[in-house]
Design a protein with these regions (language model features):
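Extended alpha-helical scaffold/assembly modules in large eukaryotic proteins
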Residues: 5-6, 10-270
């Protein structure tokens, strides 16, 4: 009986351990939440003048250049970072949330496009790198440019009314704005791609690999041409060089086939 009672008492202690741990967790959460709420209350009570100053700055903000929006948003976010919990504190004030969010959206959207365009424009093909990975990298960069313009188009459709209302510049969002720079970057990328394919064609010795390279080059050139709406003079020259190499490779392939056919006919006649 003693053994059983020990087991029962032991089981009772083990069962109570998780309950004690859970209680400690709950106490800790209550204390943390209370401290956070107290910090929010303190900010609401002590930062009122500062927040009302920011409200006036946001409400009166009007821009003609998207770069100025970027600078303003950076400044605003730096100022708001001093609050313990931005959303929780600002909801106690008449904060112009829609305008602040619209400015952030415009600034971040523009910076994202600028980053993509810069990445593509600054790309340098390293001839020491194998051809396959180099071409894949250029394809990946082009897809980023495509997505950037697509996202810009969607953003423009949803944002036009809000941006006009909040005096946020939109000229950078037009087809003649930053999208034109992205398309130019894609054209330059196509030129580098085709030059790499042309250089590689001189090194491969015909066969399926040569044909695959030509197809890759032409397909990429076509995609970029459709996306950008045309090529500049330098890129058109690179395309013509690729086209000439493709014709030359095709003629060589035909000559080899004819030569093989003649050799086969002679051996059969013998």
């Amino acid at each position: 009986m003693r053994r059983d009672s020990r087991r029962e008492s032991g089981g009772s202690c083990e069962a109570s351990a998780p309950t004690t741990a859970t209680a400690k967790d709950m106490i800790g959460e209550i204390e943390n939440r209370s401290a956070h709420l107290l910090a929010i209350k303190t900010d609401v009570e002590t930062q009122g003048d500062f927040i009302r100053f920011l409200i006036k700055e946001v409400e009166s903000a009007a821009f003609t250049d998207i770069e100025d929006v970027v600078l303003f948003v950076k400044w605003l976010d730096d100022e708001l970072s001093y609050l313990v919990d931005e959303r929780a504190v600002l909801k106690h004030f008449d904060w112009p949330e829609h305008k602040a969010d619209a400015m952030r959206e415009a600034a971040f959207g523009y910076c994202d496009l600028k980053k993509i365009e810069s990445e593509a424009s600054l790309f340098r093909d390293d001839p020491r790198q194998p051809c396959g990975p180099a071409l894949k990298k250029m394809q990946a960069l082009f897809e980023k440019l495509e997505h950037g313009v697509y996202n810009l188009s969607r953003m423009r459709e949803s944002a036009t009314g809000r941006y006009k209302l909040f005096q946020i510049p939109m000229n950078w969002m037009l087809d003649t704005g930053y999208a034109s720079q992205i398309k130019l970057a894609s054209v330059k990328l196509a030129m580098k791609y085709m030059k790499r394919v042309s250089a590689e064609l001189e090194m491969v010795g015909g066969g399926p690999e040569e044909e695959e390279l030509i197809v890759q080059g032409v397909r990429f050139a076509f995609r970029v041409h459709q996306f950008a709406g045309g090529f500049d003079v330098e890129t058109m020259r690179a395309f013509q060089e690729l086209r000439d190499k493709a014709r030359s490779c095709h003629e060589q392939c035909q000559n080899q086939q004819q030569q093989q056919h003649r050799t086969l006919c002679r051996s059969t006649a013998c």
